[in-house]
Amino acid sequence: MSLSLWQQCLARLQDELPATEFSMWIRPLQAELSDNTLALYAPNRFVLDWVRDKYLNNINGLLNTFCGADAPQLRFEVGTKPVTQTLKTPVHNVVAPTQTTTAQPQRVAPAARSGWDNVPAPAEPTYRSNVNVKHTFDNFVEGKSNQLARAAARQVADNPGGAYNPLFLYGGTGLGKTHLLHAVGNGIMARKPNAKVVYMHSERFVQDMVKALQNNAIEEFKRYYRSVDALLIDDIQFFANKERSQEEFFHTFNALLEGNQQIILTSDRYPKEINGVEDRLKSRFGWGLTVAIEPPELETRVAILMKKADENDIRLPGEVAFFIAKRLRSNVRELEGALNRVIANANFTGRAITIDFVREALRDLLALQEKLVTIDNIQKTVAEYYKIKIADLLSKRRSRSVARPRQMAMALAKELTNYSLPEIGDAFGGRDHTTVLHACRKIEQLREESHDIKEDFSNLIRTLSS
């Protein structure tokens, strides 16, 4: 019996689990087999508890399959083992459209510096942290749409410079990417108060570089950015077509990774889809972990509204929160803005917050949403997206090239409009409500199983809500 047993388990787990789950939870594990005991080492307690809770039965089942009565006992521990005694899971890209994987060059961290065991006291130059102390993991509302992103960010905060470096978060505007950046920064500094953590928008990096060139201070610029312990850059897509900035960031990126210094980047799109950015940079963006943040589902939208109201000492009836969440679906920022308007109107008028009051306070916003998202608009958008005719969506054709877009359009109609299932079915060629319900459940299932369907749904939501 040897560590090849764990390799067999890894191969099977990679086949059985979604790519995101495998990369996030199984990949960081290290294994040691001795005395008929397989010890699995997790980088921190968070990963250990999650793996033991979610995947213990899977792993034990595989051990029994491969070894039968001779299956080793399983033991979990927090920590790492020497390289000669460990076996790490190979790196795989996650949450990515189907694509050809670019091999990642081997990176060997310098032995002299871990970057995190001994963080020095602040020294010149003075670092501008810019981390907003108000954005923490505690006040980030978690749901299915952002669960993986939050979990990855939490792990980076607990173990910066580790397995998820760089961490790349992508998704539409107002979905919580910036909140998570600040939460990681706050988490790192809570753990290491003297850590040099710098948050910035990508345009600030460009501005700093331009000033450095103008003032003949490019070496100081390089020293500043290459000596931080964690660099958190928002909206990296603004590097597009800025060749000199991309060149400098390329070398900064390499220097930070070689020093085991953490990099977190955000964008409104998947790395490979960022136009105007060099391929060598886009390739590096995907070296660590890439995770999507999607528009919040109904339950999460309600939870966001209730939490925001609670923070403002406002009693928000559940039916009112549901009413708002059902009608405003695109992003968190829009939800919070609408609630702020409701609260302000209630304070000015002294009236109770009811559904009728909300209808009045948000009448222009609600009217705009209802005007923008109609079943006709959904059918037109879906037909264009899948390059079929609207008539195909209404027809009786059952080929997958038509049936799947039809199901997608029905699911979007249920998500984005207030029409009943029978009304939606009637708009799709006179189908009954059970057909619509089946379509909605099918798309929900496929969003869990297929990255392509998940991406299609998110792209269409963004298009229809913009």
Curated annotation (Swiss-Prot):
> Gene3D superfamilies in the record, alphabetically?
1.10.1750.10, 1.10.8.60, 3.30.300.180, P-loop containing nucleotide triphosphate hydrolases
Region entry Domain IV, binds dsDNA: which residue ranges? 347-466
Per UniProt, subcellular location reads as: Cytoplasm
Alphabetized InterPro entries for the sequence: AAA+_ATPase, Chromosome_initiator_DnaA, Chromosome_initiator_DnaA-like, Chromosome_initiator_DnaA_CS, DnaA_C, DnaA_dom, DnaA_N_dom, DnaA_N_sf
**Which residue ranges does the record annotate as region Domain I, interacts with DnaA modulators?**
1-86
Q: Where does ATP bind?
A: G174, G176, K177, T178
Chain positions covered by the region annotation Domain III, AAA+ region: 130-346
According to the record, the residues making up region (Domain II) are 86-129
* Biological-process GO terms, alphabetical: DNA replication initiation; regulation of DNA replication
Q: What is its main location?
A: cytoplasm
- Give the similarity note: Belongs to the DnaA family.
What this protein is called in its record is Chromosomal replication initiator protein DnaA
Species, as recorded: Salmonella choleraesuis (strain SC-B67)
